[in-house]
């Protein structure tokens, strides 16, 4: 459940520090409380995230229609929250195991792997191309497929959990 509900809770907490939430202080007042250095580092990281999502082809070109790409700027706050939510939930899960024997694998998957499988299952969806196009243009949330694949690509612990070696498919 840490990979699912834990991530959702961490996601909502992270909104307090995303591209919008970062503009409010501890009392909820709009206030630039970040140092110039912190703001510059945040912008550099979020620019990378925007470019990563902008490069995602959500629908290929067909029948005279151009390909449709994700909109990294539109979905930035949610993508930041997905990144943060995963990290918060992973830390909470590991803290819950402190001083305890690690749970046994289930169906051949380690507890760490099951954490990420729980996350992927949370965002599983089956939608028509027309809805993919509509959501990509209007929704501040990335499509479920990309909430998983594009988010996990930035998390070294995911690669470690599944023993993914550096190679041509390594992101």
Labelled PLM ranges:
Residues 1-6, 16-171:
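Zinc-dependent metallohydrolase catalytic domains
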């Amino acid at each position: 459940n840490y990979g699912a509900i834990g991530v959702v809770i961490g996601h909502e907490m992270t909104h307090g520090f995303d591209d919008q939430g970062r503009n409010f202080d501890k009392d909820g007042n709009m206030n630039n409380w970040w140092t110039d250095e912190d703001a510059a580092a945040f912008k550099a990281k979020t620019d990378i995230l925007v470019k990563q999502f902008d490069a995602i082809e959500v629908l290929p070109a067909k029948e005279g229609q151009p390909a449709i790409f994700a909109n990294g700027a539109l979905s930035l706050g949610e993508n930041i929250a997905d990144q943060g939510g995963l990290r918060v939930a992973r830390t909470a899960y590991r803290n819950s195991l402190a001083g305890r024997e690690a749970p046994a694998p289930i169906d051949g998957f380690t507890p760490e792997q099951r954490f990420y499988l729980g996350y992927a299952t949370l965002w599983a969806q089956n939608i028509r191309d027309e809805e993919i196009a509509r959501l990509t243009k209007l929704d501040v949330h990335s499509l479920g497929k990309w909430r998983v694949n594009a988010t996990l690509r930035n998390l070294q612990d995911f690669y470690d959990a599944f023993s993914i070696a550096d190679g041509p498919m390594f992101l």
